[in-house]
């Protein structure tokens, strides 16, 4: 299994992120996120990645959110937002994306993500479920959620 590492907020990571921008779409770019964290001198990095040798081949950002105001879940637990999961083309379908998601699940908190085009099968396989669309809350996104077994399931449907 691939080892997930917290990525340092520094110029080396900034250079590594540039290789993703070449292959990815603009909305997946994490360069701006990383640059703002560097400017703020934020040492608590939300970025995680997997290396193949010395090369960063998969990455994501993971943020813990205060659950007291969420409408995604039937509880007030804090949850994680998993953003911008991306694996370089030559390394896809080798378990790196799954390893990142399993790493996020290991925190034992519910997870919310916004899937990208053509990724529905991946998120289904990882156990994520759609929530009922809410125009004000979701603002054009189509969020998916995952909840650990010890927390009550909610698909966003009202009783």
UniProtKB/Swiss-Prot annotation:
Top-level taxonomic group: Bacteria
UniProt source species: Bacillus pumilus (strain SAFR-032)
Residue ranges of domain N-acetyltransferase in the record: 7-151
Keyword Transferase: yes
Enzyme Commission number(s) of this protein: 2.3.1.-
GO molecular function, one term: acyltransferase activity, transferring groups other than amino-acyl groups
Cross-referenced Pfam families: Acetyltransf_1
Protein name per the record: Uncharacterized N-acetyltransferase BPUM_1403
UniProt keywords, alphabetically: Acyltransferase, Transferase
